[in-house]
Each structure stands twice: as structure tokens, then as C-alpha cells.
């Protein structure tokens, strides 16, 4: 990690910048060697897709699916146009937030050659490419929100409150205030990609706000937070060297392990209670328990390679089974549904 890098200053090259007119031993202009190699449009598109960290999109898609399922079971409404528009809007905000994270982690000297995200470190993309792509995605999200306003019965002030609340959370996680760097990132993600996203998908469909979608979002929010916590625990040493503070750094390795297990297994306790007292269909998420134990063993052995990606996969499967369980539950068996 480039510990000598000045915070807020982007240092792309490892050595000194070649001066105008400098040549190598073969007589070639050194400035030409600093340029990125020409790549095909397919390679360029693949680079943009990888920069979005698509493996993390389960944190966006499952809340949208859950909110839509709650709307269907409680009010009997499900407009496919609103479902697609909501999914694209949330994915756009999530992807843009990932790009903001990439940009600011690099500019603060946090990302390095051994980091999981080396989009800027390896010059896969240039900083200005990441910025422009992020602006495009935020704009796309706003366009989708405008379309949702035209199609949904939800009041403008309610739609704007939820949507721009989520957008602000995705940006301020590392941009602006930078909640991630002051141990508040976990709280932001827990709210944004849990209750807020579920409420957004639900309200867009039914045209009103309610409290019960926030309650149903709790198991999914805990699972999503497990993804972030595994990522922060893996990066604990590099984050500490960069001078930032995350929850994983504050509580240390032992309590981080305890917290990860709590986030991992508490949803299963909730599903067991619901399956026992409400509907057996809510036992479907329990099919993913073996995967959860596998992740626990990997965390305990401190083998953090690909742990966030594997936790995100569990988050996706658990969320889908949860949604199917709600849809399959008999009418009146679940509270408010």
C-alpha cells in the first residue's frame, strides 16, 4: 500500500512521470509507454462491468424482490413495469456507489496491488472513466425514478424521500463525509440496502408507505451486512495503515468473528420462528444453512480470499428462498399478509 500517498491526491504511476522529450534506450518516447494499451470495445465493456463489482448486486436485487412480493401478498398488486423500473433504479444507484467507493479508496491510498478491487491500481480504467461512469449511472437512476413517478400511484414527496435517501447513502458511504472511514459505513449499508430498498419497492407498487415492510426486511438486512463486514474484516490491516476506522477495526478480530456469526445465523433463527408459528414455507431459507457453516469455518480460519463474494452468494440464495417462502405462504398466515 502506498502509505506515503497524500490523502485526496490520486497517484497513478509508481515512478516519476516522464518529462517531455525523455526517451528510453531504444529511442522511444517515454510518454507513449505510460499510456494505456489500446483495447477492443468488448474488453472496455468488460472492464466497466467488472468495476461495478456485480457479485455484490444481490444486496440490491433481493430487497426489490422482497418489497414487490410483500406488495403482491398484502395488496394483490404487482406491475411488471414498476418492478423492472425499480430494479434498474436501485441497481444503478448501487453500481454508482461502488464506483464512488473505488475512486475514493484509490485517491486516499487505501487500494493497492493486493487489494480485491484493483480497477484503478492496475489502470484497468482511468479515474476520469470511473467518475464519468458513476455520473452516468446516477443519471440513469434519476431517469428511472422519474419514470416510476409517472407510472406509480406513490406521491412525489414520498418517492423522492426514499430514492434520494438511498442515493445519498450510496454516495456518502465513501464520498463527501465518507461514513466508511469513520466506522459508520455499516450503519449506512444496513439501512440503505435493507429497510430502505424494501420500502422503496413496496411503496412504488402500492402507492403508500407502511411499517411492516421494514420488519420483514430485517433478516435480509442482517445477511447483507454480513457481506460488508466480511469485506471490512478482510481489509482490516490495509485500512488501519491508511488511517481510516471501520467497525471491524474498532472491535478487533475476535469480536468481528462473533459479529459475523451473529449476522450470518440470526436470520435463520428468525426464519425458524416464522416457520414454526406462521407458515412452513418460511423454512425454505434454511436450505442454505450448510453454506453458512462453510462460511463460518472459512472466517474462523482467517481465509478471507473470496469470502465477501461467497457471502454475497449466500445473501442472494437466502433472499430468493425468503421471497419464495412469502409468496407460497397461505393467505392470512403471515402478519399483514
UniProtKB/Swiss-Prot annotation:
GO MF entry, a single one: prenyltransferase activity
Keyword flag Transcription: no
One Pfam family of this chain: UbiA
Biological pathway: Quinol/quinone metabolism; menaquinone biosynthesis; Cofactor biosynthesis; ubiquinone biosynthesis
EC number: 2.5.1.-, 2.5.1.39
Biological process (GO), any one: endothelial cell development
Membrane topology value: Multi-pass membrane protein
Main location: endoplasmic reticulum
Subcellular location: Endoplasmic reticulum membrane; Golgi apparatus membrane; Mitochondrion membrane
Description of how the protein assembles with itself and partners: Interacts with HMGCR and SOAT1.
Protein name, entry field: UbiA prenyltransferase domain-containing protein 1
Organism: Ailuropoda melanoleuca (Giant panda)
Gene name as annotated: UBIAD1
